[in-house]
A protein has these predicted regions:
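Short, glycine/charged-enriched secondary-structure capping and boundary segments
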Residues: 21-22, 48-51, 120-122
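Short, electropositive, low-hydrophobicity segments enriched in small/polar residues
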Residues: 13-15, 53, 113
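N-terminal phosphate/diphosphate-binding loop that engages ATP/GTP or pyrophosphate donors
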Residues: 25-101
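Gly/Ser/Thr-rich helix-start
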Residues: 10-13, 50, 118
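Conserved beta-strand scaffold positions in the cores of enzyme catalytic domains, especially
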Residues: 103-105
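Walker A/P-loop phosphate-binding motif and the immediately C-terminal alpha-helix
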Residues: 3-40
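Cytosolic-facing regulatory segments adjacent to core modules
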Residues: 81-96, 107-127
Length: 127
């Protein structure tokens, strides 16, 4: 049985802490857990207890412009495009995920500068 749990809410209310705790609990019960951090201020790695040296190895999806264009059909940081809402996501978690305590973590990444464009194609890959 596959289950997707999405958590959203106001900033500073403990979403990352809750998600990290749930992910670790599910993993400790033997479930395969993929945790996805789509927060521009990504802190789920810390909530999962990843050591600093492992956090520095995280490669974010938003950095992969060619992958995003290939899978969604849209150029990154451009407006007014039509793109696939159901892109092929095969291999993404294996390639970009980092494992710790039974949880595989994938991080979207942050908008680096004001006016950086729409992050819609990147976000579609996370569905």
């Amino acid at each position: 049985m596959a289950l997707k749990i999405a958590v959203s809410g106001k900033g500073g209310v403990g979403k990352s802490t809750l998600c990290g705790t749930l992910a670790l609990l599910f993993a400790s019960d033997g479930f395969d857990v993929l945790a996805i951090d789509a927060d521009p201020d990504a802190n789920l790695a810390s909530a999962l207890g990843l050591p600093v040296e492992k956090r520095e190895q995280i490669h974010t999806i938003s950095e992969e412009k060619e992958l995003i264009e290939e899978r969604t059909g849209a150029k990154v940081a451009q407006f007014g495009q039509v793109f696939s809402l159901n892109p092929d996501v095969a291999g993404i978690s294996e390639r970009y995920g980092i494992s710790h305590n039974g949880v595989n973590l994938v991080v979207l990444g942050a908008v680096k500068r004001a006016g950086g464009g729409c992050a819609c194609p990147e976000s579609v890959l996370l569905k």
